[in-house]
Structure formats: C-alpha cells, structure tokens
UniProtKB/Swiss-Prot annotation:
Name of the protein in its database record: SH2 domain-containing protein 1A
Regions of compositional bias (Basic and acidic residues) in chain numbering: 116-128
Localization terms from the record: Cytoplasm
Region (Interaction with FYN SH3 domain): 67-92
Keyword Acetylation: yes
Assembly with partners or alone: Interacts with CD84, CD244, LY9, SLAMF1 and FYN. Interacts with NTRK1, NTRK2 and NTRK3.
Gene: SH2D1A
Cystines in this chain: none
Lineage: Eukaryota, Metazoa, Chordata, Craniata, Vertebrata
Location of the SH2 domain: 6-102
Length: 128
C-alpha cells in the first residue's frame, strides 16, 4: 500500500478532511487507514464542501473491494491501483469520479516556495 502515492497511512479523519478541504477541488481524494476497523482503509473524496468516505478492504482471496452506494454491483480488483483507476470514471457508485489525487510526499523532501517560505513537505496536489 505504501507504493500508492495517495495513501497517507494512519492519519485521523479530521486530518484527512483538512487536507481535502485545503484543495478546494471537487473530486480531490486520498486513502488513509480506517480509525474504527483495523485492516480496512478509507477512500475519502471531496464534493461540494463535504467529505465522502468509502471503506476499502483487502479480501481473503487477495482482491480489493470498495463499499459504494447501495444497489451498485460490487467489483473486485487485483490491485488497489486498479480500483482507483476504475473510480476515476463516472457512475461507479461514488459521489463524483476521482479526479485530483492528494499525494503524500516523502518526508525527506522539503521545498521552498517563491516567497522563500517553507511549503508543507508532507502533501501536494497532483492535477491532471
């Protein structure tokens, strides 16, 4: 999971929401560990000022699955990256297609902006 750039690990729901709201872009998304269910992940998506959270889990057979809107056919994916790619398309049972990945930067990287101030080394938004 660490190879997935939108995976932020064990961050709180509040921290994830702040990261998404800071983008201001509907369709911004990230993955984090679930706080309430061990071994489960949360796919968090910004839409119209609200954060929508979908549980993502790794099945016993090694597939990945996401809990989506009721009535939507459950799909299984071999890799988490395939799940993310599928949800970048419309009508997949989530509120809006995944559009703007909020990626976690390596903590070893630190940048200075044009103003000379240190920018946040932990997160950046990747636009298509």
């Amino acid at each position: 999971m660490d190879a997935v750039t939108v995976y932020h690990g064990k961050i709180s729901r509040e921290t994830g929401e702040k990261l998404l709201l800071a983008t201001g872009l509907d369709g911004s998304y990230l993955l984090r560990d679930s706080e309430s269910v061990p071994g489960v992940y949360c796919l968090c998506v910004l839409y119209q000022g609200y954060i929508y959270t979908y549980r993502v889990s790794h099945t016993e057979t090694g597939s990945w699955i996401a809990d989506t809107a009721p009535g939507v056919h459950k799909r299984f994916f071999r890799k988490i990256k395939n799940l993310i790619s599928a949800f970048q398309k419309p009508d997949q049972g989530i509120v809006i297609p995944l559009q703007y990945p909020v990626e976690k930067k390596s903590s070893a990287r630190s940048t200075q902006g044009a103003t000379g101030r240190r920018e946040d080394p932990d997160v950046f938004l990747k636009t298509p």
